[in-house]
């Protein structure tokens, strides 16, 4: 990956222009380049700064679809989880999940055990092709009451009989996984530019003649031409097409504001836990009475979620009000009374929009969106070279993007081959065993950083870690980590020079581990100083960049409009945006 080059968007007519640099757009760009297409990818903010960045970090294997008797989705989800464990083993790994059982109707071992048995039988091929044993998904098992209380002593003991344990996938860093797809596409010749917003489709003769793109860093505009335009802008996709869709209503539908938050609690083990929430799934055929809330170890913190709310406002306005956050905390405390969470325990929150089912704005028991929306606008609006993909599940992004690129290829050249992303490892994934890679990194950084920092470097960059460490030899950057962190000083420079980081927030939230769970402390000032040197900021700009990052950690009365990411523009303003 090289430095940002907005001018390259005006260099030629591309085969496909992908709008949206989240997981769906990144997967589509990677897929199209592997099929030999020339690709441009534009993102209005930073790559993976919206919905994709703020997910719950799970790569789901489809067990939830048992209660819907939707075996097709179950099998597809399991297959995609397996592929991510193979194609990006440094960024995805198994996580054990505990589901407590009780001597109550629909919450006992018999029903849950039957479900686990069926799931294991339906997914016997889940580890096919996964070379690293540490990345394989084990069979489910049961533990007794004493053992589950040993793991989670704050569980309510009344009627508790034990627990089931199943394994799912967890992303180490969702933003870096998206970046791995973007970087892989660029290695194959794609042009990718962040802070480049698609403002308007320029139509003529029942086709998109060009797309007007604005550079948020300079205010410049360019008209990008492509044979096919793939709109993968997530919840912003309908707004881009609002004028086109005004009379058709093809893109209308409800969106869920999915929310989760990070708290100052640290489990002494790697197990997540699924607790009974207060809402039900009206589409479930077989149900354990309520939807699950998850508490998951997340670095040195705990991630809690997910809560859903029908959202009808603009995606730029996504927010969580303080009273909502208090209700979320109360619900967790009710499910696990001994936990005793308070508002002061919350270090960060994430929220964003995903397509939902048909729901009224005041509904509490909500219907999930079941499948991504893939729209051929030749049929929907008579625009022959426009395709829209609005994704639902991060896990399914690769497969859904492949379907979208199939449609793109049919419009360009039906003889183009099938997708290869199901078997092509991402950049940095060229290793057999992650523990061996981490050991190699530890040896390389011996004397300047500990094992935790070495492991983090291996997770974030895979075999590309050497390109990061090489920058530490420059005296003005220096070796070792930022104060009190596992982030190497060289990672800041690498983010700017090789990964298009344009703002301090890009570095802190999406390129490094500095703020994956909470405020990075003194390391933030050091990172700002390094970024200022790399990007040529004056003191006023450095302070402004710091202020934007600091606002991300406001919890409480001022949190109502504190969106997870902002787009700093030339006038010094900040446009709110979010995602989950």
Which role does the model predict for each range below?
Residues 57-151, 290-293:
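Dinucleotide-binding Rossmann-like beta1-alpha1 core, especially the glycine-rich loop
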């Amino acid at each position: 990956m090289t430095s940002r080059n907005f001018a390259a968007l005006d260099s030629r007519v591309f085969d496909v222009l992908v709008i949206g640099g989240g997981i769906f757009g990144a997967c589509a760009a990677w897929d199209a380049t592997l099929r030999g297409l020339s690709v441009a990818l534009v993102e209005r903010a930073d790559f993976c700064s919206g919905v994709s960045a703020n997910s719950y970090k799970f790569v789901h294997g489809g067990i939830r679809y048992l209660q819907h008797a939707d075996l097709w989705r179950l099998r597809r989800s399991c297959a995609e989880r397996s592929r991510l464990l193979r194609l990006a083993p440094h960024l995805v790994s198994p996580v054990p999940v505990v589901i407590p059982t009780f001597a109550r109707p629909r919450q006992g071992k018999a029903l849950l055990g039957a479900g686990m048995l069926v799931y294991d039988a339906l997914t016997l091929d889940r580890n096919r092709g996964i070379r690293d044993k540490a990345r394989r998904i084990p069979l489910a098992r049961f533990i007794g009451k004493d053992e589950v209380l040993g793991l989670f002593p704050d569980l309510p003991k009344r009627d508790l009989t034990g627990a089931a344990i199943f394994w799912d996938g967890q992303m180490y860093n969702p933003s870096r996984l998206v970046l791995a797809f973007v970087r892989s596409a660029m290695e194959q010749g794609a042009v990718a530019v962040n802070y480049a917003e698609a403002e308007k489709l320029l139509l003529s003769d029942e086709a998109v003649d060009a797309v007007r793109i604005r550079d948020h860093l300079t205010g410049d505009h360019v008209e990008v031409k492509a044979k096919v335009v793939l709109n993968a802008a997530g919840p912003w996709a309908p707004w881009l097409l609002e004028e086109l869709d005004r009379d058709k209503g093809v893109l209308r539908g409800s969106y869920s504001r999915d929310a989760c938050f990070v708290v100052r609690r640290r489990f002494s083990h790697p197990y997540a836990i699924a607790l009974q929430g207060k809402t039900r799934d009206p589409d479930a055929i077989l149900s354990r009475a309520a939807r699950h809330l998850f508490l998951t170890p997340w670095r040195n913190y705990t991630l809690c979620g997910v809560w859903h709310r029908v959202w009808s406002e603009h995606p730029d306005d996504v927010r969580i009000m303080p009273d909502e956050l208090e209700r979320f905390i109360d619900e967790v405390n009710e499910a696990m009374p001994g936990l005793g969470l308070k508002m002061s325990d919350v270090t960060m929150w994430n929220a964003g929009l995903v397509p939902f089912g048909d729901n009224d704005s005041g509904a509490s028991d909500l219907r999930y969106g079941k499948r991504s929306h893939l729209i051929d606008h030749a049929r929907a609006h008579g625009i022959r070279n426009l395709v829209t993909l609005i994704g639902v599940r991060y896990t399914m992004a690769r497969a859904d993007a492949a379907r979208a690129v199939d449609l793109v290829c049919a419009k360009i050249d039906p003889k183009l081959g099938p997708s290869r992303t199901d078997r092509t490892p991402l950049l940095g994934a060229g290793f057999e065993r992650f523990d061996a890679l981490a050991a190699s990194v530890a040896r390389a950084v011996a004397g300047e950083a500990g094992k935790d920092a070495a492991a983090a470097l291996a997770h974030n960059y895979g075999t590309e870690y050497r390109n990061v460490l090489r920058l530490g030899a420059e005296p003005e950057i220096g070796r070792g980590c930022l104060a009190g962190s596992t982030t190497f000083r060289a990672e800041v420079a690498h983010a700017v020079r090789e990964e298009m980081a344009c703002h301090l927030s890009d570095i802190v939230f999406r390129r490094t581990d500095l703020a994956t769970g909470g405020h990075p402390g003194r390391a933030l000032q050091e990172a700002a100083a390094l970024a200022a040197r790399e990007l040529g900021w004056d003191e006023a700009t450095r302070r402004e960049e710091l202020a934007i990052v600091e606002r991300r950690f406001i919890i409480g009365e001022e949190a109502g409009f504190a969106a997870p990411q902002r787009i700093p523009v030339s006038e010094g303003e900040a446009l709110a945006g979010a995602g989950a």
